[in-house]
């Protein structure tokens, strides 16, 4: 179960109430009155915990679990241990996420790191022209610049700087040591520690006798329900804006260049870099360490495998991989042929044998 020093659960709940709140069903209606006090993995859960099984790889852990209750797909119901009450869901992991949010709402929406919510710490600095909504939390060392607007119930973490003119919507969590400049953030945005948003894009007119800096005159627009992982960077536009679409989730250590436009619901995994003026459609997935060159389009629903190097436009709904990135079936065939070639060379067989 979660360490109570860091993660304090809300009040215990009955399985009947949980099932109702997440839109799932109990395998046995008589279990509706059973109480659980929190969530935990299958291998560490106790009799008062609720767990889940989503990946069949963990079926053995499910058969041996001491959890009091478990969320499972109906196909696993008949093989459940006798001691485990079941909540049935076609999407167990999603259902578990909803339950974990119920028990730990602060973790789902950002937890302040110092003091109580709704307080402005005496060591926070707020410009007289800034406008703060009700219930705003400012932690020690926060600086709020001229003309800044912050929505209701937003938390700004320790030593974070919000530059002049920026706006932050309601119910946001901006973690410690973040810098925001030239940026507008929507509602329910979560920004993890160390993120940099709105700094200069990397723009230079290159040549002799020296490289001339091009003033970056755009902004960063972060729409509602976006999450940006620790130590990621989002450069402001050179003239057009850099845009992060609604519901997009960005992992740690991601670089997003100037003028990039990212659609709704995209997933961008750690150490990915997106060069300037590239456009991503809706629900694009970029796996870890993907590199994307500038001035191209990755259309909606496309997926790029880890370490892929995207140098051309990617059609909608396609899976690409490799260096340079290509349709994933083609890339896999190339990998197989290279392995065959390597074996032939080691054995001294000619390639056409």
Swiss-Prot record:
Q: Which UniProt keywords apply?
A: Acyltransferase, Lipid A biosynthesis, Lipid biosynthesis, Lipid metabolism, Repeat, Transferase
Q: What class of enzyme is it?
A: transferase
Q: What is this protein called?
A: UDP-3-O-acylglucosamine N-acyltransferase
* Pathway, per record: Bacterial outer membrane biogenesis; LPS lipid A biosynthesis
Function, as annotated, reads: Catalyzes the N-acylation of UDP-3-O-acylglucosamine using 3-hydroxyacyl-ACP as the acyl donor. Is involved in the biosynthesis of lipid A, a phosphorylated glycolipid that anchors the lipopolysaccharide to the outer membrane of the cell.
**What does UniProt list as catalytic?**
258
Entry-linked SUPFAM superfamilies: Trimeric LpxA-like enzymes
What's the EC number here?
A: 2.3.1.191
Assembly information from the UniProt record? Homotrimer.
Mind telling me which GO cellular component terms the entry cites? membrane
To which protein family does this belong? Belongs to the transferase hexapeptide repeat family. LpxD subfamily.
Task: Output the Gene Ontology terms for molecular function.
Answer: N-acyltransferase activity
Extract the PANTHER family matched here: UDP-3-O-ACYLGLUCOSAMINE N-ACYLTRANSFERASE (PTHR43378), UDP-3-O-ACYLGLUCOSAMINE N-ACYLTRANSFERASE 1, MITOCHONDRIAL-RELATED (PTHR43378:SF2)
**Reaction(s) catalyzed by this protein?**
a UDP-3-O-[(3R)-3-hydroxyacyl]-alpha-D-glucosamine + a (3R)-hydroxyacyl-[ACP] = a UDP-2-N,3-O-bis[(3R)-3-hydroxyacyl]-alpha-D-glucosamine + holo-[ACP] + H(+)
Q: What are the BP-aspect GO terms?
A: lipid A biosynthetic process
């Amino acid at each position: 179960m979660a360490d109570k020093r860091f993660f304090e659960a809300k009040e215990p709940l009955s399985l009947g109430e949980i099932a109702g709140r997440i839109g799932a069903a109990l395998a046995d209606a008589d279990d509706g009155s059973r109480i659980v006090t929190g969530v935990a993995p299958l291998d560490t859960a106790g009799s008062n915990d609720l767990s889940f099984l989503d990946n069949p790889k963990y079926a053995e852990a499910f058969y041996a679990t001491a959890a009091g209750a478990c969320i499972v797909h109906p196909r696993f119901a008949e093989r459940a241990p006798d001691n485990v009450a079941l909540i049935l869901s076609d999407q167990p992991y999603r259902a578990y996420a909803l339950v974990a949010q119920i028990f730990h709402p602060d973790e789902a929406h950002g937890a302040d790191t110092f003091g109580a919510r709704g307080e402005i710490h005496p060591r926070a600095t707020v410009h007289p022209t800034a406008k703060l909504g009700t219930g705003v939390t400012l932690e020690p060392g926060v600086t709020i610049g001229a003309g800044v607007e912050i929505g209701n119930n937003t938390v700004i973490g320790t030593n974070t700087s919000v530059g002049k003119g920026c706006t932050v919507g309601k119910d946001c969590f901006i973690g410690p040591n973040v810098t925001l400049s030239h940026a507008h953030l929507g509602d329910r945005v979560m920004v993890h520690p160390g993120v940099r948003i709105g700094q200069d894009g990397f723009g230079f007119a290159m040549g002799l006798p020296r490289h001339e800096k091009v003033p970056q005159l755009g902004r960063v627009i972060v729409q509602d329900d976006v999450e940006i992982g620790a130590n990621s960077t989002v450069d402001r536009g050179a003239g057009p804006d850099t845009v992060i679409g609604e519901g997009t989730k960005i992992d740690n250590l991601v670089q997003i260049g100037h003028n990039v436009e990212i659609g709704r619901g995209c997933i961008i995994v750690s150490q990915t870099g997106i060069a300037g003026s590239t456009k991503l459609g809706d629900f694009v997935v970029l796996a870890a360490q993907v590199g994307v060159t500038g001035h191209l389009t990755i259309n909606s629903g496309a997926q790029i495998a880890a370490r892929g190097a995207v140098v051309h436009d990617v059609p909608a709904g396609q899976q690409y991989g490799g260096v340079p990135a290509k349709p994933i079936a083609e890339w896999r065939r190339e990998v197989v042929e290279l392995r065959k070639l390597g074996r032939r060379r080691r054995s001294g067989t000619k390639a056409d044998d």
